[in-house]
Amino acid sequence: MSSAIETKKVVVEEIASKLKESKSTIIVDYRGLNVSEVTELRKQLREANVEFKVYKNTMTRRAVEQAELNGLNDFLTGPNAIAFSTEDVVAPAKVLNDFAKNHEALEIKAGVIEGKVSTVEEVKALAELPSREGLLSMLLSVLQAPVRNLALAAKAVAEQKEEQGA
């Protein structure tokens, strides 16, 4: 009996630490997915460096209380799987949202984004954002535009002066 309780405590600690450490956590209902679909989902999440696990709701509830994310308890009914990402905030939301579009059986329930409990709508809005690299490239192109325009204007003036001088 004691070893079972100790094992459960370890699992609760594991879930709580993942909830605290992850930048983004998404809770999904995977009922209705067959084995090959779940395997494909796990593969896509693994490629995005996202951990995907199924835990008992009672242990998850205790971990949620430890992590002080009590707003999640309302979503912990039925079979749930949890996707954790410690690197990218957008990755789990994007992969799960894209997968849910193709497989109606997968339902996004809620999430934790940078320590804040988020609704399904917020998770889906996050999924529509470009990745960090995409946002950085957009920012870089916006920052380069004035310099590029100045260089083109200077080149045009130089060519015009050259034509007038010739």
UniProtKB/Swiss-Prot annotation:
- The UniProt gene name for this protein comes to rplJ
What is the phylogenetic placement of the source species in the record? Bacteria, Bacillati, Bacillota, Bacilli, Bacillales
One Gene Ontology term of the molecular function aspect? structural constituent of ribosome
Q: Which GO terms describe its cellular component?
A: cytosolic large ribosomal subunit
The question of whether Kinase is a record keyword is answered with no
Pfam families recorded = Ribosomal_L10 (PF00466)
Task: State what induces this protein.
Answer: In response to low temperature and salt stress.
Subunit composition and interactions: Part of the ribosomal stalk of the 50S ribosomal subunit. The N-terminus interacts with L11 and 23S rRNA to form the base of the stalk. The C-terminus forms an elongated spine to which L12 dimers bind in a sequential fashion forming a pentameric L10(L12)2(L12)2 complex.
Give the protein's recorded name: Large ribosomal subunit protein uL10
Q: Which organism is it from?
A: Bacillus subtilis (strain 168)
The role this protein plays is: Forms part of the ribosomal stalk, playing a central role in the interaction of the ribosome with GTP-bound translation factors (such as IF-2, EF-Tu, EF-G and RF3).
Taxonomically, which superkingdom? Bacteria
Q: Which InterPro entries match?
A: Ribosomal_uL10, Ribosomal_uL10-like_sf, Ribosomal_uL10_bac, Ribosomal_uL10_bac_type, Ribosomal_uL10_CS_bac
